[in-house]
Amino acid sequence: MRSNRQIFTLAALFVAVALPAHGASLEARKMQAQQEADLSDKLVLTNKTCGSHVKATIDWSTFNEAESLKTAVTPFCAAALDAIEDICSDEIGKQTINEKVKTVTCAGAAAPAASFADGALTFSFSLTPNQNKLLVRDYLEKSL
């Protein structure tokens, strides 16, 4: 009997820990998987252009699920990769990207912003039209 209670307690703990990670609806999880695949395709082009091995992720916890179901996140996120490609248009830029940029994280925010620390570029944006690529490019050119 005690063994069953321990198993139940462990199972309940596992479910409680796993729920936040899997709290998104099936529709949202499918959309996220598709958008991550789209971002991965774009990342292949960026890495080919730059001769780099940058990794990219979308921090889904920072986006409103209903809003991200209506408006694709990937095109906004791709602005950061476009900015990196622009910087790679010459050898100095390629070398700098390869030496310094290791990851790109796209996150939701009220206003667009870029930050860079320890090889990690974080690009935050809302899902409304704006000049994301320009913001990231200007930021990287001044910060790298």
Question: Language-model features: where?
Answer:
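Active-site recognition of the HExxH zinc-binding catalytic motif
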Residues: 130-144
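Short N-terminal segments immediately surrounding and downstream of signal-peptide cleavage
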Residues: 25-42
